[in-house]
A protein has these predicted regions:
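Structural signature of the thiamine diphosphate
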Residues: 15-66, 85-88, 154-184, 188-191
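Glycine-rich beta-alpha junction loops
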Residues: 53-59, 101-103, 130, 197
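Acidic/glycine-enriched edge-of-secondary-structure segments
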Residues: 62-77, 136-143
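A general structural motif
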Residues: 72-86, 126, 145-149
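Anionic-ligand anchoring segments at beta-strand to alpha-helix junctions in alpha/beta enzyme folds, i.e.
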Residues: 93-160
């Protein structure tokens, strides 16, 4: 944006519902400081963040020192919530696991979800456009939900009494009816696990939530 408070406000309003954090560079000598802060907030929220750089700064040459990105460790779900989730799953007659992008991005999460699925004998569905969130050759893999998804996956999750949602915010592309099948199990208990607590429960009602690292 150009250096104008009115223009800056317009840009902020355009993106405010799409990003977790916004900041504008006011002083070219502090651009790296601002960028560092924007990156940290994007990592903290596991979501996009926006930096606004006024046009008259684009061609400026400055001397800067590059600061280190500050790393941090996120808290994970509490013992009570984990115990409650374990009880829900162990007592379930028809549990289903739904893997999202977070499973792909988390080290070892695909193998962990595979081991859990085998222990529970639970079918595994994946979210829209996240077929890589579970091995396609595994006998418990049911397929993707949502647009052009798997009818088998939709039929299976429709009858679930507990759905363990891993690394997904349950957006409409993964929960809206497909092929005329209104498959999202409204009476099932939903356990949602995600790195960003702001996304938990924001799209679909959940019975138990576990923010994770």
């Amino acid at each position: 944006p150009i250096r104008s408070s009115a223009a800056s406000d317009v840009y902020k309003r355009q993106f405010e519902d799409m990003v977790a954090y916004q900041e504008e560079v006011r002083d070219p000598t502090r651009i790296v400081e601002v960028l560092n802060r924007v990156i940290m907030n994007a990592k903290r929220a596991s979501a996009p963040a926006q930096i606004n750089i006024p046009r008259d700064m684009w061609t400026q040459v400055i001397d800067i020192d590059l600061p280190a990105i500050v790393e941090f460790e996120r808290p994970s779900g509490g013992d009570n919530a984990i115990s409650e989730a374990a009880e829900m799953l162990s007592s379930s007659k028809n549990p289903i696991i739904l893997n999202g992008a977070g499973v792909v991005l988390s080290e070892g999460a695909i193998d962990a979800s595979k081991a859990l699925a085998e222990r529970l004998d639970a079918a595994v569905c994946v979210g829209y456009q996240h077929n890589d969130a579970f091995p396609g050759s595994h006998p418990l893999f049911a397929g993707p939900l949502g647009y052009n998804g798997s009818k088998a996956a939709m039929e299976l999750i429709k009858d679930a009494d507990v759905v363990l949602c891993l690394g997904t915010r349950l957006n409409p592309f993964s929960t809206l009816p497909g092929y005329g099948i209104d498959y999202w199990p409204e009476d099932a208990k939903i356990i949602q696990v995600d790195i960003n607590p702001d996304r938990i429960g924001s799209v679909s009602y959940t019975h138990l939530t576990l923010p994770t690292t």
